[in-house]
């Protein structure tokens, strides 16, 4: 198994699919990485030479991925909450942010129903 950005990449999969195992790299970015490194998208990871894997590592290192990306996302949410803006308040109350209805539905975001006290 090749190790890129601290993640073990599956050997049996095509390069594009294998790169999506890294948090922050989807199909589009994986295709762009393959194009810029001139590595075939349909080549399997086990077929790549060590030099090609090093090139992939360098290319992936240019992007914000894995722990850094998770930290950046959580810091953005924390910043919204500290500002006290509408989106921050919705995050704080664990409610939908983007205008969805909450009288019915929104159970995923709100969590399980709380019993009504009498």
Curated annotation (Swiss-Prot):
Q: Report one GO cellular component.
A: small ribosomal subunit
Q: Which InterPro entries match?
A: Rbsml_uS13_C, Ribosomal_uS13, Ribosomal_uS13-like_H2TH, Ribosomal_uS13_bac-type, Ribosomal_uS13_CS
Residues covered by region (Disordered): 94-118
Q: Which residues form the signal peptide?
A: none
Q: Which GO terms describe its molecular function?
A: rRNA binding; structural constituent of ribosome; tRNA binding
Superkingdom to which the source organism belongs: Bacteria
- Which Gene Ontology terms describe the biological processes this protein takes part in? translation
Q: Which UniProt keywords apply?
A: Ribonucleoprotein, Ribosomal protein, RNA-binding, rRNA-binding, tRNA-binding
Q: Which residues cross the membrane?
A: none
Which Pfam families does the record associate with it? Ribosomal_S13
The record's listing under PROSITE patterns reads: RIBOSOMAL_S13_1, RIBOSOMAL_S13_2
Q: Subunit composition? A: Part of the 30S ribosomal subunit. Forms a loose heterodimer with protein S19. Forms two bridges to the 50S subunit in the 70S ribosome.
Into which family does the record put it? Answer: Belongs to the universal ribosomal protein uS13 family.
NCBIfam families in the cross-refs = uS13_bact
The role this protein plays is: Located at the top of the head of the 30S subunit, it contacts several helices of the 16S rRNA. In the 70S ribosome it contacts the 23S rRNA (bridge B1a) and protein L5 of the 50S subunit (bridge B1b), connecting the 2 subunits; these bridges are implicated in subunit movement. Contacts the tRNAs in the A and P-sites.
Q: What is this protein called?
A: Small ribosomal subunit protein uS13
